[in-house]
Regions:
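N-terminal small/polar loop signature for handling phosphorylated ligands or for N-terminal nucleophile
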Residues: 89-152, 247, 251-306
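An N-terminal, well-structured beta->alpha segment
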Residues: 8-105, 196-224, 236
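Phosphate-binding and adjacent anionic-ligand microenvironments
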Residues: 288, 292-294, 315-317, 335-529, ...
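Gly/Ser/Thr-enriched, mixed-charge loops and adjacent short helices
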Residues: 12, 35-40, 44, 153-279
Length: 574
């Protein structure tokens, strides 16, 4: 075994670690040296979003010690950044060890003299963002790995606006965390009196905030019997979504029993991700059985929402995040216009890999559409930047996330579920489904279709392979894709844009990010982006055609599918 790895292992075996941890290390030495090497070959990186990794012993795993060291670094930065009393909010999801990690986090903060508002039990991530603003905290942490498989856990760090860390704070916190060289530098206990348990009072304030997002409460009264099927996929959504739907006025809500109990083993699914058809399978079956109007599913920390509706043939389909975002954007913008409350400085915000239909729709409604890097922290940063100058209405991205209004600063599946049900009620009152409304928007703004493929590369070699793929695209970018010339080559890492046809160059006015985009003459857009939280590289595809009428939908839909397949083949990604 590599000497540096062995040294780290010896440090844990001989250091101030509990006996169970040492026993687990010795067991791995005997039974799985390869797994042991992976657990210690690097330090689990405190990235710009915090920690995310497999649970277990070692420097490259989520455990008490890596969580404690991260919290000590973050605590040091908070105390250096704010004079006077510093306070934080701490929450967690339904994953195995999430409560333990949240309590560890709270204890370390308190031992550093920081006041802690700790949720008494599991709660949705968006409520953590809300709590930071509600209590006027300087920061916050939620222990969650969002939609990752059950073996994972994570630690997301937030700033005083309720958003995840952005520059300069993200890099500065990373530096402080990296300074913590040993678990002996962590203040583990003392200051327990600074921890205050929170729950029902914050829940009520949050629910009132969500109720205020309703656009047409009278429509809900007319359509209160809308048949809704909801699955929390063994996660935190169960703590708030049923209450919120009831408060909105919906009376016919069926919760999928098999997935209603919070359980970190996610026994009915492999990936607790509402983007996955298999994950939504039980919910789809229940929706069919009940002849429901709408199916909704939230991931374990209830920041992503999946939606099922009947298509133009009456068959149940799952909408993707782009379709959901477009429908929500349009609903809110049209409602503001029809109610006479639209403002000349209204804006929506989306991300660089989200459908181009967002821009077309914004233009059609006379509002600005800003594009930021992937992740809601960048949407939140843009809101902060434009505060007092422009009016934020809604933001969303392709990864099944929506953020409605500016009272919280992270994606929120709880408010999204409520709004999507209201949208379904609104369309039902007009005698159509959400899918039929989507087709109407395609006719108006163009038929945009997107797809995503993820290539997984695990372990030490995987990172190198992903880096090599990105370097290959950078050094030898395609001149044309599927027969259409590339007219924009966007390198967000270098913040450079280039038109290979004319030689024109420009600067991209966004922070650096390891993303490459190729836009072709026929309007196709291909984006390559290594995941920040999983051992994957993601390729996003967006294509477009005109749609003259609803009767042409199936033909054009099939043609767009063929176009995406041809692009994937042309890029050698089959």
């Amino acid at each position: 075994m590599d000497a540096a790895i062995q040294q780290k292992i010896d440090n844990w075996l001989n250091g101030s670690f509990d006996q169970a941890t040492k026993d687990d290390i010795r067991k791995l030495q005997q039974e799985s040296p390869t797994e042991l090497a992976d657990a210690f070959y690097r330090n689990l990186e405190f990235g710009t979003g915090g920690l995310r990794g497999l649970m277990g012993v070692g420097t490259n795993r989520m455990n008490k010690y890596t969580v404690g060291m991260a919290t000590q670094g973050y605590a040091n930065y908070l105390k250096a950044s704010f004079a006077g009393e510093v306070s934080v909010a701490v929450a967690h999801d339904s994953r195995n060890n999430s409560r333990f990690f949240a309590e560890t986090t709270a204890n370390v903060f308190a031992a550093n003299g920081i006041k802690v508002y700790l949720f008494e039990s599991l709660r949705p991530t968006p409520e953590l963002s809300f709590a930071i603003r509600h209590f006027g905290c300087q920061g916050g942490v939620v222990c969650t790995a969002s939609h990752n498989p059950k073996e994972y856990n994570g630690y997301k760090a937030y700033w005083n606006d309720g958003a995840q860390l952005v520059p300069p704070h993200d890099k500065n916190v990373i530096k402080e965390v990296e300074k913590i060289a040993s678990v002996d530098e962590v203040k583990w206990s003392g200051g327990e009196s600074l921890i205050q348990l929170i729950g029902a009072e914050v829940d009520q304030a949050y629910i009132e905030m969500v109720k205020g997002l309703s656009v047409y409460p009278d429509i809900i009264r007319e359509q209160q019997d809308l048949k809704i099927v909801y699955t929390p996929i063994h996660g935190t959504g169960i703590t708030l979504v049923p209450q919120v739907l009831k408060q909105f006025g919906f009376t016919n809500v069926t919760i999928v029993d098999e997935q209603s109990t919070p359980d970190g083993n996610f026994p009915t699914v492999v990936y607790p991700n509402p983007e996955e058809k298999e994950t939504m399978g039980i919910g789809l079956a229940r929706a069919k059985q009940l002849d429901a109007d709408i199916l909704l599913g939230t991931d374990p920390d209830a920041d992503r929402v999946g939606i099922g509706v009947k298509d133009n043939h009456g068959e149940w389909v799952l909408m993707n995040g782009n379709q959901t975002a477009v429908l929500a954007f349009n609903y809110l913008l049209e409602a503001r216009r029809s109610k006479g409350i639209a403002q000349s400085n209204d804006m929506i915000i989306t991300t660089i890999v989200t459908t181009g239909m967002a821009d077309a729709l914004a233009e059609g409604n006379g509002v600005k559409c800003y594009r930021v890097l992937t992740g809601f922290k960048w949407i939140a940063e843009m809101i902060r930047e434009k505060e007092g100058k422009e009016n934020y209405v809604v933001g969303g991205e392709e990864s099944f996330g929506l953020m409605i209004g500016d009272k919280i600063r992270d994606k929120d599946a709880v408010s999204a579920v409520a709004l999507l049900c209201e949208m379904a009620a609104y369309e039902k009152a007009k005698g159509r489904t959400l899918f039929e409304k989507l087709i109407e928007l395609y006719i108006q703004y163009g038929f945009y279709k997107e797809d995503l493929i993820s290539i997984t590369k695990k372990g030490m070699d995987g990172q190198q392979q992903i880096a090599a793929m990105m370097e290959q695209y950078r050094s030898q970018p395609p001149v044309s894709i599927n027969g259409s010339p590339v007219v924009q080559l966007l390198d967000y890492e270098r913040r450079k844009g280039l038109n290979p046809q004319t030689g024109e160059e420009w600067t991209i006015d966004l922070p650096k990010s390891n993303v490459l985009q190729f836009i072709t003459e026929d309007g196709s857009m291909i984006s390559a982006r290594p995941s920040g939280t999983e051992p994957k590289i993601k390729f996003y595809f967006s294509v477009k055609e005109n749609l003259s009428n609803a009767g042409e939908f199936d033909r054009v839909n099939k043609a767009l599918d063929g176009k995406i397949k041809a692009i994937i083949a042309d890029m050698g990604l089959e």
